[in-house]
């Protein structure tokens, strides 16, 4: 699961939500992120400290080594190839899904197996939260995962001040 470079709380929050879905469905998954260059150090520290969450993160280079022809790359919070955390990883994986809430750019990620694009959503975290409502039980979501999703929504809505709707 990979967001954009200089990950913010929405990119990380939505990735953590999808990681929850993968955990519940017993599918191995990790978040591709640059642990030094991001805008969410405190959330990363909380996630690393949470029980059972020690091995959530992987570098783009390590993900390139681990990926094979059965891998699915889920890109969150961007639809532009030049903005992803690790472009070589994007280019090396044939099965890619994109979940984002931004307007479609002229240079978007093509040839995807799934494109969940909802420009009226407040955030990618909101979209993932909606997916979780239909795919996991409420008790399956860890408190730190719920916190990550809420952090992403709070960031992109400027504390629920803009771009909110009945779904938010």
Task: Tell what function each PLM region has.
Residues 4, 30, 73, 96, ...:
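Hydrophobic "anchor" residues on beta-strands that sit immediately upstream
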Residues 42-43, 86, 109, 161:
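Short, well-ordered secondary-structure micro-motifs
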């Amino acid at each position: 699961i990979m967001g954009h470079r200089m990950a913010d709380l929405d990119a990380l929050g939505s990735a953590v939500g999808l990681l929850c879905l993968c955990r519940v469905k017993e599918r191995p998954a990790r978040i591709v992120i640059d642990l030094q260059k991001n805008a969410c150090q405190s959330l990363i520290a909380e996630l690393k400290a949470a029980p059972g969450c020690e091995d959530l993160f992987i570098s783009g280079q390590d993900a390139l080594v681990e990926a094979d022809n059965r891998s699915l790359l889920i890109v969150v919070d961007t639809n532009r190839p030049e903005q992803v955390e690790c472009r070589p990883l994007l280019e090396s994986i044939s099965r890619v899904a994109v979940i984002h809430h931004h307007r479609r750019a002229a240079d978007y990620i093509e040839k995807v197996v799934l494109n969940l694009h909802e420009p009226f959503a407040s955030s990618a975290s909101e979209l993932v939260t909606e997916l979780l409502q239909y795919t996991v039980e409420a008790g399956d979501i860890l408190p730190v995962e719920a916190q990550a999703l809420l952090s992403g929504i709070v960031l992109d809505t400027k504390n629920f001040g803009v771009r909110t709707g009945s779904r938010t």
